[in-house]
Every structure is written in C-alpha cells, then in structure tokens.
C-alpha cells in the first residue's frame, strides 16, 4: 500500500485474487509421403506464458510476518522442432527404420523478494536440447532383430542476479 509491503487480511480465504496467468500453445505437424517406403514428418511446437505467481510461497511466514513479498515464475518459453524420417524398404541392414532429429529450447525463471526488503532476486535457466534417435528392425527368417541409437546434447545456462528496486 502506497509503495510499501503491507499485510492485509483476505476477506475470502478461498479466493486468491490475481492468481491467474495466460499461456498460449501452438502445434503444427507436416507429413509427406515421398514415395512408397519413405515418409517424412515435421513436428513444430511453441509455448509461452505470462508470469505465474506462487501464492503458496506468499503464505509462508517468518515469525508473524510474510517471508516473501514477491515470488513468481517469469514467462516460460518452449520451442520444439522435430524431423522424423520413416523408411520401410528392405535393405541388408533393416526392413524398417525410424530416425528423428529434434531440438528443444526452454527458458524459465524464478523471481522473489523478501518481505520489506528492496532486493529482488532473479534466477534464469536456458536449456538447448539436441537429440538423435534411430530405431531399426530387421526380420531374419522367423526372428526379428531390433536395434537403435539414442544421442543427445544438453546445453544448460543458469544465471542469477539481484536487483535493487528503490
């Protein structure tokens, strides 16, 4: 109230005023049958949100006063792009193959400020995830042999800083 952290009793303890957030998700898939036995698929996904308040953190007490004046997740962002190639033509090595290359980028953050303190803490995580997955199947007489490969690279970047808000 008037720029000061204040403790106010909620008249309806079952209602968390201002606890909503917005989010959008977009998904698009493209498929293409190049010829018999060769199938391509592209999967694109995008997700983004507004700040997401953590009211459970705001109800924590330190003595008789709130522990935090602010505690929320910053906007969360996620991008996925995956290309899959499916082969069903018989070769010496396989009868069926499914190979997927994918990238996923994620950014999320956490922001908090202790009650009646003028320092806001920011923690930001950025992840870049690259994957390759290959599955193969070969029939040999009455038997079926399955084998594959799974590889991934995770790049994680975490940063933190404090902001003086006055």
Sequence positions of predicted segments:
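Surface-exposed beta-strand-turn/loop segments characteristic
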Residues: 1-21
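Short, flexible, mixed-charge acidic loops at enzyme active sites
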Residues: 2, 58-59, 159-165
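Flexible loop and strand-edge segments within Gram-negative outer membrane beta-barrel domains
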Residues: 17-23, 33, 37-94, 105-127
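Membrane-embedded beta-strand positions in outer-membrane beta-barrel channels/transporters
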Residues: 25-27, 80-84, 100, 129-135, ...
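Transmembrane beta-strands of outer-membrane beta-barrel proteins
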Residues: 40-42, 95-101, 143-149
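Transmembrane beta-strands of outer-membrane beta-barrel pores
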Residues: 46-50, 103-107, 140-142, 151-157
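Short, conserved acidic/polar surface loops in the N-terminal third of protein domains
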Residues: 111, 157-160
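Pyridoxal 5′-phosphate
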Residues: 128-130, 150-152, 164-165
């Amino acid at each position: 109230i008037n720029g000061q952290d204040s403790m106010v009793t909620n008249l309806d303890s079952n209602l968390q005023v201002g606890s909503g957030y917005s989010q959008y998700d977009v998904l698009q898939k493209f498929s293409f049958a190049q010829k018999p036995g060769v199938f391509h698929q592209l999967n694109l996904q995008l997700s983004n949100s507004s700040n997401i308040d953590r009211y459970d953190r705001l109800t924590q007490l330190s003595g008789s006063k709130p522990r935090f004046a602010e505690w929320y997740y910053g906007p969360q962002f996620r991008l996925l792009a995956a290309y899959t190639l499916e082969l069903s033509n018989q070769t010496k090595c396989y009868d069926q193959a499914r190979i997927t290359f994918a990238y996923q980028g994620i950014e999320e953050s956490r922001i908090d400020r202790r009650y009646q303190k003028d320092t806001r803490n920011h923690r930001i995580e950025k992840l870049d995830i690259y994957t390759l997955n290959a599955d193969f199947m070969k029939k040999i007489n009455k038997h079926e042999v399955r084998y594959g490969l799974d590889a991934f690279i995770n790049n994680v970047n975490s940063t933190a800083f404090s902001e003086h808000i006055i």
